[in-house]
């Protein structure tokens, strides 16, 4: 658990705030996130998290994220030379999910841990949906995408389970602290999707004809930003990326998430697991990207998400 969260939990035990010496809160808190966080429906169900669909457009057809496998993104690109366009969860999408939550959990508080507001309108659309609903909804911009957002959601869900006395405001403050200590980056196997996509800030500066060039795409203040470059095989890149990120952000060693898009070779997965063990990580978990981030990373991408001490 994050040390900074202990301060939040102490606040929850202050007079009038619930916690020690007072009954648990009677109103349930329900967590919400977008499908772009790449939690599977099964994992989200285990955590008690409701998922709101983002969208992917291929030509004139727009489909909900999660309703088809990401391999179809690759097939569309191979066929057309165009990367599918991603779009936010709409106001209607949030209204539908908020209504479902209210019908199953009357009077519940809703805490929405949002996909980065700098990259999509989902956060704004959730605010609009909440304003017209009359429900108790708190939206928090995690300033993360994909597995970075998932890591924040997972930690917040664990915190809520362990401390049901938390108010939505305290849980939201805790989620912001978690997000500030969460660091995500990934490395595409090739540059094709970055060239065709255009969603990554300053990506053009890293695109060249050099073979085996792998730009590291990190999340900075909610935006995807191209940073340092790696050369060589993805096996070597994966090992170096783990070492570099663990050192740069002083990662806690209790948990490290691995990001993989479809097509990542098994030898890269094994190398990553071996490197994580040698760096002292106690647990690792692989998360397969969904359609939204796959549109940016392409096939065979590898990344990590960790937590600063």
Predicted regions and their residues:
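Broad hydrophobic/π-residue packing in well-ordered secondary structure
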Residues: 58, 62-63, 70-75, 98, ...
């Amino acid at each position: 658990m994050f040390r900074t969260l202990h301060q939040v939990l102490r606040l929850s035990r202050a007079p009038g705030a619930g916690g020690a010496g007072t009954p648990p809160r009677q109103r349930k808190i329900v967590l919400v996130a977008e499908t772009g966080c790449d939690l599977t429906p099964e994992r989200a169900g285990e955590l008690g998290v409701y998922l709101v669909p983002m969208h992917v457009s291929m030509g004139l057809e727009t489909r909900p994220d999660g309703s088809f496998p990401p391999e179809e993104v690759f097939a569309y690109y191979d066929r057309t030379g165009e990367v599918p366009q991603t779009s936010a969860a709409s106001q209607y999408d949030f209204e539908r999910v908020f209504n479902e939550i209210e019908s199953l959990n009357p009077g519940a508080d809703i805490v929405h841990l949002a996909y980065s507001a700098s990259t999509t309108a989902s956060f704004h659309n959730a605010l609009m949906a909440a304003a017209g609903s009359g429900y108790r909804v708190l939206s928090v911009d995690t300033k993360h995408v994909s597995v970075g957002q998932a890591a924040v959601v997972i930690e917040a869900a664990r915190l809520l389970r362990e401390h049901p006395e938390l108010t939505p405001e305290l849980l939201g403050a805790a989620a912001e602290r978690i997000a500030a200590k969460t660091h995500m980056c990934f490395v595409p196997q090739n540059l094709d999707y970055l060239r065709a996509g255009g969603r990554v800030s300053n990506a053009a500066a890293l695109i060249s004809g050099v073979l085996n060039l792998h730009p590291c795409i990190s999340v900075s203040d909610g935006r995807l930003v191209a940073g340092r470059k790696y050369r060589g095989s993805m096996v070597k890149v994966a090992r170096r990326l783990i070492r570099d990120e663990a050192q740069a952000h002083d990662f806690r060693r209790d948990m490290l998430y691995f990001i993989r898009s479809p097509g990542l070779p098994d030898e890269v997965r094994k190398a990553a697991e071996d490197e994580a063990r040698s760096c002292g990580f106690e647990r690792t978990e692989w998360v397969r990207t969904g359609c939204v981030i796959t549109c940016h990373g392409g096939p065979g991408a590898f990344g990590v998400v960790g937590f600063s001490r």
